[in-house]
UniProtKB/Swiss-Prot annotation:
Subunit structure: Homodimer.
Protein's GO biological process: glycine biosynthetic process, by transamination of glyoxylate; glyoxylate metabolic process
Membrane-spanning ranges: none
SUPFAM superfamilies reported for this sequence: PLP-dependent transferases
UniProt xrefs under Gene3D superfamilies: Aspartate Aminotransferase, domain 1, Type I PLP-dependent aspartate aminotransferase-like (Major domain)
Enzyme Commission number: 2.6.1.44, 2.6.1.51
Gene name linked to the record: AGXT
Name of the protein this chain belongs to: Alanine--glyoxylate aminotransferase
Keyword tRNA processing belongs to the record: no
Binding sites annotated in the UniProt record for substrate: R382
Family per similarity comment: Belongs to the class-V pyridoxal-phosphate-dependent aminotransferase family.
Transit peptide: 1-23
Length: 414
């Protein structure tokens, strides 16, 4: 073997001699994983949890298209079309509208990293896990975080928020439009105007609500809005949508310190996404194939129309609510006007372990629902109807599966 390597080294020349010598003096100590020598196998699942949701055929097909270079003109054209799609689904004319190469958490972090500076006052509506996450990130950035904490299922009134604005004089308020951990739909009308009266920016999480409930970024005075790809848009997780008002942009561009993240620096991302009128420069390699799928998800929602999508989700949720109540289950959010159409929460029925019910549905029927998350853990079951999954047929499937689960899962005697 060594003679063969020596001959190979001589034949390839001095530049190749180094790696030939390296191969001769080292051994592979880690074998190829046996699991990777088998074909990939994916089970069939009906994803009726809080996300991700199933992919429609058009979105799946987009994910199988051939790769383009991330700086090709055709890729930039796709990015421009995505930006227009975001402006439509957000109902905004903001030029600073783009995609973050990362999940909804990444968009939240991008918003906070670019807007907040050390010492800034940050008012956070914490009525579920997403407010908790926003407060956590704010603390890491050195902001003075002021949580307005409510139990799962709670929401915020204009009066409550105004009291917080007057007391803490924040530069930024965070609210979750669709709190998927508790199933609450937070009203937004009037909050933007209220924030601006106190010289405060309004940041809204619409990951679970976008496309499923009415949302008007410009008309509702929302300064920063973000969402995800894997809910109503029915695209793979891993990309997120983000838009900034001119007021928010001015705050970012006039900050005294650099944002703590290069990857999430909006000034660079604005150039990458063609938002600053300058020739595009390399910043990072975008997930090109994921952008294909996101583009198709936005296209499907655009073809359907926002108002039709909102109506579809409202009707599917109402049908689900009726079927659940017919089973004797209690909806966690009492006020119908505050129920998130895309994610319904049900109080865990007395005597049952929520994990038994979730496991029964996935193992017996291949249907995913989930338990609570963060503060709602152990309190609720969560059922999602998003995008192509928001149908009466799926409601019938999941409620019949729940009926059987309640008959077969162990129940403690009280």
């Amino acid at each position: 073997m060594f003679q063969a390597l020596a001959k190979a080294s001589a034949a390839l020349g001095p530049r190749a001699a180094g790696w030939v010598r390296t191969m001769a003096s080292h051994q592979l100590l880690v074998a190829p994983p046996k699991a990777l020598l088998k074909p990939l196998s994916i089970p069939t699942r009906l994803l009726l949890g809080p996300g991700p949701s199933n992919l429609p055929p058009r979105t799946m097909a987009a994910g199988g298209l051939q790769m383009l270079g991330h700086m090709h003109k055709e890729t930039y054209q796709i990015m421009d079309e995505i930006k227009e799609g975001i402006q439509y689904v957000f109902q905004t004319r903001n030029p600073l509208t783009l995609v973050i190469s990362g999940s909804g958490h990444c968009a939240l972090e991008a918003a906070l990293i670019n807007v907040l500076e050390p010492g800034d006052s940050f008012l956070v509506g914490v009525n579920g896990i997403w407010g908790q996450r926003a407060a956590d990130i704010g603390e890491r950035l050195g902001a003075r975080v002021h949580p307005m904490t409510k139990d799962p299922g709670g929401h915020y009134t204009l009066q409550e928020v105004e009291e917080g604005l007057a007391q803490h004089k924040p530069v930024l308020l965070f609210l979750t439009h669709g709190e998927s951990s508790s199933g609450v739909l937070q009203p937004l009308d009037g909050f933007g105007e209220l924030c601006h009266r106190y010289k405060c920016l309004l940041l809204v999480d619409s990951v679970a609500s976008l496309g499923g409930a009415p949302l008007y970024m410009d008309q509702q005075g929302i300064d920063i809005l973000y969402s995800g790809s894997q809910k109503v848009l029915n695209a793979p997780p891993g990309t997120s949508l983000l838009s900034f008002s001119d007021t928010a942009k001015n705050k970012i561009y006039s900050r005294k310190t650099k944002p703590s993240s290069f990857y999430l620096d909006v000034k660079y991302l604005a150039n990458l996404w063609g938002c600053d009128g300058q020739p595009r420069m390399y910043h990072h390699t975008t997930p090109v194939v994921s952008l294909y799928s996101l583009r198709e998800g936005l296209a499907l929602l655009s073809e359907q129309g926002l108002e039709n999508s909102w109506r579809k989700h409202r009707e599917a949720a109402a049908y689900l609510h009726g079927r659940l109540q017919a089973l004797g289950l209690r909806l966690f959010v009492k006020d119908p006007a505050l129920r998130l159409p895309t994610v319904t929460t049900v109080a865990v029925p007395t005597g049952y372990d929520w994990r038994d019910i979730v496991s029964y549905l996935i193992e017996r029927f291949g249907i995913e629902i989930t338990g609570g998350l963060g503060p709602s853990t152990g309190k609720v079951l969560r059922i999602g109807l998003m995008g192509c999954n928001a149908t009466r047929e799926n409601v019938d499937l999941v409620t019949e599966a729940l009926r059987e689960a309640l008959q077969h899962c162990p129940k403690k005697k009280l």
